[in-house]
């Protein structure tokens, strides 16, 4: 295992983005109430198809036919947990890749226990901030809701261990994003602090990661490409935005117009 995270090339991101736009994956998002519309728009901008099917019986049916599933526990409650269990079980049986976004895990008991329960169904990837990843790995962390008081690099050892234990890819997002399968580590720079001042960029990234997990080929590379594309779009949107209000439309526009030749 590399002790120093490798960099990720624009050419690698370009290859994955081309594959993603061509595949146009159907992504089933069981996500939180605050970010549903924004998440759907981000997926649409990248030529994916979002769906939010929340009834437990229907969620199970839909996850079996979707290309990927996102589980985001931001606004978790008991009925939604039932739907998530059903969807994850169905996805697992169908071989559908699913991604866990463990929002505020470590700070609240029900969601922490629930997310640890879901790990038995082997997610294709886990995407969270440093505090969430450290808490999910069973380490002490400092977080407040969706905000993290821990540095993403400090959480990398926990991410590696979690990836090895579960057999998954773990993404720790922050000023620098780190992606690991427990053996290989990749660093993704870029993005902008503006992305932390609007609701939903991290949650939307998790949905994009789910879509990229459905692609054929090296999953670690595809997941890293998802982070690269979102960070680049955020950085470019910030450069032409006046503030958070104008950032969101510029961000969606950049995702919509971003092509492989812009990356390579």
UniProtKB/Swiss-Prot annotation:
Superkingdom in the source lineage: Bacteria
Pathway assigned to this chain's UniProt record: Cofactor biosynthesis; thiamine diphosphate biosynthesis; 4-methyl-5-(2-phosphoethyl)-thiazole from 5-(2-hydroxyethyl)-4-methylthiazole: step 1/1
Q: Which UniProt keywords apply?
A: ATP-binding, Kinase, Magnesium, Metal-binding, Nucleotide-binding, Thiamine biosynthesis, Transferase
Reactions it catalyzes: 5-(2-hydroxyethyl)-4-methylthiazole + ATP = 4-methyl-5-(2-phosphooxyethyl)-thiazole + ADP + H(+)
Q: Which residues bind ATP?
A: 127, 173
Gene3D superfamilies, alphabetically? 3.40.1190.20
GO BP field: thiamine biosynthetic process; thiamine diphosphate biosynthetic process
Q: What is this enzyme's EC?
A: 2.7.1.50
In its keyword annotation, does this UniProt entry include Repeat?
Answer: no
User: CDD domains from the xrefs?
Assistant: THZ_kinase
The coenzyme or cofactor needed here is: Mg(2+)
Q: Which GO terms describe its molecular function?
A: ATP binding; hydroxyethylthiazole kinase activity; magnesium ion binding
Q: Which residues bind substrate?
A: 52, 200
Q: Does the keyword Transit peptide apply?
A: no
* Record function comment: Catalyzes the phosphorylation of the hydroxyl group of 4-methyl-5-beta-hydroxyethylthiazole (THZ).
- Listed name of the protein: Hydroxyethylthiazole kinase
